[in-house]
Amino acid sequence: MSNERDTSRTPTPDHAEHNAFFPSPYSLSQYTSAKTDFDGADYPTPYKGGKKVLMIGTDERYILMQNGSMFSTGNHPVEMLLPMYHLDKAGFEFDVATLSGNPVKLEMWAMPGEDEAVKSIYAKYLPKLKAPQKLADLLEQAVADDSPYAAVFVPGGHGVLAGIPHSREVKRLLNAFLAKDRYIITLCHGPACLLAPAVEEKPEDYPFKDYEICVFPDALDTGANLEIGYMPGPLPWLVGENLQKLGVKILNKGITGQVHRDRKLLTGDSPLASNNLGKLAAKTLLEAFAR
């Protein structure tokens, strides 16, 4: 039976930071679950060629909101770990990097505690999540013609907004991956990373102009996410709005688990797309590299 604690729409204080808040109990009851929709990862002929996927995680937990509160966030564990599970099973191992080299911050309140696939891949990569590489330190290798990476993966969670969209290192990496025909995989708020190539550039030179993507809808961040107490205040800026200003075309209106591929860019709309995006990414990379 629900109690007052489960139905409160008031964000929960995070006492590790001044005026910081986790999502409300009610919002977590609506947005999280003990298991995902994972339904298997069958890749009978996994890749054995040695190319890896570079996962860029967020190293910042707190987002300063417009009302002065801090949203205690990070990367969403399902959005990170389910795509990783599929790609790992398909034969593509991961390197993990953050902008600073500090640990990846996860929204542990969204971890599906009864999902064995998610738990197993989390355990496998936990050492790398706790001690990632600094992106700048591996950038030269990552953008080289003989790069060890088949793709870059930027998972979602509101924590992505903290630094990744403004990073010159991310800008250089994404531009190089576009130029060298490598894959970019991202979902939910992760497509905020696609703003990095616009840093210090003219809008008309934006490389993702006219690309079609799936991304978490701004309408939920300005509506339901505030109404149910998922966030303690309005975001400082909106992902979709800023991408659309640069000419990106957003396909989804809501969150249904929709995924999309446009050229070498693979995107998903929300945590609900995690399993679908993992399947799409694994299939795509196997077709491209398992030859």
UniProtKB/Swiss-Prot annotation:
Its EC number is 3.1.2.-, 3.5.1.-, 3.5.1.124. The keyword Aminoacyl-tRNA synthetase does not apply. One of its GO terms (cellular component) is cytoplasm. The active site is at 188 (nucleophile). It comes from the Bacteria. GO terms for molecular function: glyoxalase III activity; protein deglycase activity; thiolester hydrolase activity. Residues 1-18 have a biased composition (Basic and acidic residues). Belongs to the peptidase C56 family. HchA subfamily. Keywords: Cytoplasm, DNA damage, DNA repair, Hydrolase, Stress response. It catalyses: N(omega)-(1-hydroxy-2-oxopropyl)-L-arginyl-[protein] + H2O = lactate + L-arginyl-[protein] + H(+); N(6)-(1-hydroxy-2-oxopropyl)-L-lysyl-[protein] + H2O = lactate + L-lysyl-[protein] + H(+); S-(1-hydroxy-2-oxopropyl)-L-cysteinyl-[protein] + H2O = lactate + L-cysteinyl-[protein] + H(+); N(omega)-(1-hydroxy-2-oxoethyl)-L-arginyl-[protein] + H2O = L-arginyl-[protein] + glycolate + H(+). It is an enzyme of class 3 (hydrolase). It comes from Pseudomonas aeruginosa (strain LESB58). This is Protein/nucleic acid deglycase HchA. NCBIfam families: PRK04155.1. InterPro entries: Class_I_gatase-like (IPR029062), DJ-1/PfpI (IPR002818), HchA (IPR017283), Prot/Nucl_acid_deglycase (IPR050325). SUPFAM superfamilies: Class I glutamine amidotransferase-like. It is found in: Cytoplasm. Residues 1-20 are annotated as: Disordered. GO terms for biological process: DNA repair; methylglyoxal catabolic process to D-lactate via S-lactoyl-glutathione; protein repair. The keyword DNA damage applies. Protein and nucleotide deglycase that catalyzes the deglycation of the Maillard adducts formed between amino groups of proteins or nucleotides and reactive carbonyl groups of glyoxals. Thus, functions as a protein deglycase that repairs methylglyoxal- and glyoxal-glycated proteins, and releases repaired proteins and lactate or glycolate, respectively. Deglycates cysteine, arginine and lysine residues in proteins, and thus reactivates these proteins by reversing glycation by glyoxals. Pfam families: DJ-1_PfpI (PF01965).
